UniProtKB/Swiss-Prot annotation:
One of its GO terms (cellular component) is cytoplasmic lattice. GO terms for molecular function: RNA binding; structural constituent of cytoplasmic lattice. Contains an atypical KH domain with amino acid changes at critical sites, suggesting that it may not bind RNA. Component of the subcortical maternal complex (SCMC), at least composed of NLRP5, KHDC3, OOEP, and TLE6. Within the complex, interacts with NLRP5, KHDC3 and TLE6. As part of the SCMC interacts with the SCMC-associated protein NLRP4F. The SCMC may facilitate translocation of its components between the nuclear and cytoplasmic compartments. Forms a scaffold complex with KHDC3/FILIA, and interacts with BLM and TRIM25 at DNA replication forks. It comes from the Eukaryota. GO terms for biological process: actin filament organization; embryonic pattern specification; establishment of spindle localization; establishment or maintenance of apical/basal cell polarity; positive regulation of double-strand break repair; positive regulation of double-strand break repair via homologous recombination; positive regulation of meiotic nuclear division; protein storage. Belongs to the KHDC1 family. This is Oocyte-expressed protein homolog. Pfam families: MOEP19. It comes from Bos taurus. It is found in: Cytoplasm; Nucleus. Residues 40-101 form the KH domain. PANTHER family: OOCYTE-EXPRESSED PROTEIN HOMOLOG, OOCYTE-EXPRESSED PROTEIN HOMOLOG-RELATED. Component of the subcortical maternal complex (SCMC), a multiprotein complex that plays a key role in early embryonic development. The SCMC complex is a structural constituent of cytoplasmic lattices, which consist in fibrous structures found in the cytoplasm of oocytes and preimplantation embryos. They are required to store maternal proteins critical for embryonic development, such as proteins that control epigenetic reprogramming of the preimplantation embryo, and prevent their degradation or activation. The lineage of its organism: Eukaryota, Metazoa, Chordata, Craniata, Vertebrata.
Amino acid sequence: MVDNAGDYEARGDRLLGFPLPSPRVRIRPWWFPAQELRNPLVFFLEAWLADLIFGPDRALVPEMEWMSQALLMVDAVDAGNLVEVTVFARPAVQRQVKSVLLSQASVHREQRARAEKMEQLEEFLKAQAPGPQVPQHPVA
């Protein structure tokens, strides 16, 4: 009995020395056909856009996968400035998912550009103002 316990402890110590499995290893969902894993569609997005689209820590990916019936992999590349989006699905679904994601990215880019322009306009107006701003009320 003591020998078995010693063997168990030695084996447990060895197991602790192994590296953890890669987070990219996933089990194929039951609803996804294996043959659709052959030809993925790959495209790139800026990392800040991926954070907005896929949520913090890519929390929205499973829901997007279920709704689109496609598998998505979102991996950081280029020192965290870009992310690689890989879409596994039928070709028509791949194109649709890519189109939706790029449309979302376009909307977020436009919103960011609009916000930056508004900040610049506010700074310009503050710089042009002759003194402290006093709200003027129209006389009724």
